[in-house]
A protein has these predicted regions:
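Extracellular adhesion/carbohydrate-binding repeat motifs centered on closely spaced tryptophans
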Residues: 1-171
Length: 171
């Protein structure tokens, strides 16, 4: 048995574009019916927005990644539009509101690791001083609220008494 050119024909469905499942149940990003291995980004389909790496959906991605609409928190490969908190990627820790990075956040916010000072939406691990949020003013050391600090701390408004990391205005 020998096969010569032209004996077998492969049909490509060129209408397949964007995210779709192949016959084995794997999800890929298609362009003109072919898996686009050059594509890395976030792509939408009917089930959500997904992290794609080299043309394949990366269901193991837990990060903050970007597409043309902004930066988003990804859990299990999917943008988590319900998440509000602080999430990490290779560039730092970011304030997330409804799944998207809030680059306007200048506050003290919390995640499962503690309370952190954010400037421009990013945790500033170099910040040392006092900073406020909706719950009060806090002593920040290395970008995190120092709940072990009791003593005096100064900022541009004066010298303040701090108890367990929080400014005590009653003294």
């Amino acid at each position: 048995l020998s096969i010569k050119p032209g004996d077998a024909k492969v049909t490509v469905d060129t209408s397949k574009n964007g995210l779709a499942q192949d016959e084995n149940g794997n999800w890929y990003y298609y362009k003109n019916g072919v898996i686009d291995t050059s594509y890395t980004g976030i792509a939408p389909n009917a089930y959500g927005w997904w992290r794609v790496v080299n043309g394949a959906v990366d269901f193991n991605c837990n990060s903050v990644e970007a597409n043309e609409y902004g930066w988003f928190c990804i859990r299990g490969g999917k943008v988590d539009f319900d998440y509000t908190g602080i999430a990490q990627n290779a560039y730092g820790w970011w304030r997330i509101v409804n799944g998207a990075v809030d680059f306007n956040c200048n506050s003290v916010e919390a995640n499962e690791y503690g309370w952190f000072y954010l400037r421009g939406g990013k945790v500033d691990f170099n910040y040392n001083g006092l900073a406020a949020n909706a719950y009060g003013w806090w002593k920040i050391t290395g970008g995190a609220v120092d709940f072990n600090y009791t003593g005096m701390a100064q900022n541009e408004y004066g010298l303040w008494h701090v108890v367990n990391g929080m400014v005590d205005f009653s003294r």
